[in-house]
Swiss-Prot record:
SMART domains noted in UniProt: AAA (SM00382)
Gene3D superfamilies xref list: 2.40.10.170, Bovine Mitochondrial F1-atpase, Atp Synthase Beta Chain, Chain D, domain 3, P-loop containing nucleotide triphosphate hydrolases
Catalysed reactions, semicolon-separated: ATP + H2O + 4 H(+)(in) = ADP + phosphate + 5 H(+)(out)
Name of the protein in its database record: ATP synthase subunit beta
Membrane-topology annotation of the record: Peripheral membrane protein
């Protein structure tokens, strides 16, 4: 949605280079940086066109350089360009829930227009330092492996790493469900430069798992903003800001806890790099834009906790050629509070969520923040799993019987821990037939302590697979015992 004004300030296209346009305005009527410009008229084929651009540079000599948010095909020099006098603005509020928008805040789900009384500009200042929540607090997700080993910070930023088919989407949907049911919060999903098919699949999966209510969108738990792979770089560069702006409304006005998903943060950087050279900037390392740090910082600094609400962000991070030193992921890492790494090995074993307990990290896992009991339990779990990992080669060559008594006990407990880290999800009920479980942090710590202390050494390891709290595992063990008689 773009604020339209009277035709008072009209310029003319002087040059078109792909998605970048040069526009000349009368003397003293130059539009400001980030203003939205509208091109409406007929192209050479006689078809109506409506293109929105955003001012990026003032070139001097009465010219501005702007980046288009949609295809520039058919535009010609001399076409009229109207300065709207304001940045691109998007609709905000509960009216956005259950709907899909593009970068301009226009609905693209064929469900009719969105008549929002309130719109926010996508370029906004980060919250003032005095309004920030400075005391770190843990954001309970109800997912055992996350809460115990990689606790999320309320208002923090978490990187989600994982290849195709290891369960990124399912974890995202479970988090969306849990924040809505347990925290009374909402979510915003920013699809930045990913495949159109994935966006479509995600929408349908959300309808299937009741995250989106198709009949009454206002009962949905999420708003979706898409800027797909096939769209011009201008749209991909700004769609993250459009999603963030919708999330900021829920935080600042509705005073809610918000989850913001960005899939994929790398594509945001990639789009900026595509536009940068066309804007005449000198490329930096590996061909990225020289403003890489600023671009990422402007987005990330707005994702934070205030005294009244929080935006906790989970960002899928694509690592080009698995090179963590590439400037794009390296710049992103500087802003992250934690990483959740999904392991294909665990997914192959059928352990879901397939979060790697040794590869995932969190800055929140400190005794001063989570408490001594939580910290000790988490470190003991990791130490047991690490020892099991070291022993796997010996087991593969010599067999389990060749291990010492202590090591055999460690292996048995590690296998129970590994299985107890799995959990049935609410959003996967449709596929698994098992009812979903939300496990509080207290129950999680209690369960793992009981396994580590040896209290449950006599229970079969399959009793710990896909259960919620430890009481369920004990009940499942009794059922297995009764069935085997």
């Amino acid at each position: 949605m773009v604020t339209t004004t009277e035709k008072t300030n009209i310029g003319y296209i002087t040059q078109i280079i792909g998605p970048v346009l040069d526009i000349e305005y009368p003397s003293g009527k130059m539009p400001q940086i980030y203003n939205a410009l509208l091109i409406r008229g007929k192209n050479q084929a006689g078809d109506e066109v409506s293109v929105t651009c955003e001012v990026q540079q003032l070139l001097g000599d009465k010219q501005v350089r702007a980046v288009s948010m949609s295809s520039t095909d058919g535009l010609v020099r001399g076409m009229e360009v109207i300065d709207t006098g304001a940045p691109i603005s998007v609709p905000v509020g509960t009216i956005t829930l259950g709907r899909i928008f593009n970068v301009l805040g226009e609905p693209v789900d064929e469900k009719g227009t969105v008549n929002s009384e309130t719109t926010f500009p996508i370029h906004r200042a980060a919250p003032a330092f005095t309004n920030l929540e400075t005391k770190p607090s843990v954001f309970e997700t109800g997912i055992k492996v996350v809460d115990l080993l990689t606790p999320y910070r309320r208002g923090g930023k978490i990187g989600l790493f994982g290849g195709a088919g290891v369960g990124k989407t399912v974890i995202m949907m479970e988090l969306i469900n849990n924040i809505a049911t347990k925290h009374g919060g909402v979510s915003v999903f920013g699809g930045v430069g990913e495949r159109t098919r994935e966006g479509n699949d995600l929408y349908n999966e959300m309808i299937e798992s009741n995250v989106i209510n198709k009949d009454d969108p206002s009962q949905s738990k999420i708003a979706l903003v898409y800027g797909q792979m096939n769209e011009p770089p201008g749209a991909r560069m700004r769609v993250g800001l459009s999603a963030l702006t919708m999330a900021e409304y829920f935080r600042d006005v509705n005073k809610q806890d918000v989850l913001l998903f960005i899939d994929n943060i790398f594509r945001f950087v990639q789009a900026g790099s595509e536009v940068s050279a066309l804007l005449g900037r000198m490329p930096s390392a590996v061909g990225y834009q020289p403003t890489l740090g600023t671009d990422v910082g402007e987005l990330q600094e707005r994702i934070t906790s205030t005294n009244e609400g929080s935006i906790t962000s989970i960002q899928a991070v694509y690592v080009p050629a698995d090179d963590l030193t590439d400037p794009a992921p390296a710049t992103t890492f500087a802003h992250l509070d934690g990483t959740t790494v999904l392991s294909r090995g665990l997914a192959a074993k059928g352990i879901y969520p397939a979060v790697d307990p040794l590869g995932s990290t969190s800055t929140m896992l400190q005794p001063g923040i989570v408490g001594e009991a939580h910290y000790k339990t988490a470190r003991a779990v990791q130490a047991t799993l690490q020892r099991y990992k070291e022993l796997q080669d010996i087991i593969a060559i010599l067999g389990l019987d060749e291990l010492s008594e202590d090591d055999r006990l460690t292996v048995a407990r590690a296998r129970k821990i590994e299985r107890f880290l799995s959990q049935p999800f609410f959003v996967a009920e449709v596929f698994t037939g098992s009812p979903g479980k939300y496990v509080t942090l207290e129950e999680t710590i209690k369960g793992f302590n009981m396994i580590l202390s040896g209290e449950l050494d006599d229970l079969p390891e399959q009793a710990f697979y896909l259960v919620g709290n430890i009481e369920e595992a004990i009940a499942k063990a009794e059922k297995i015992k009764a069935d085997s008689k």
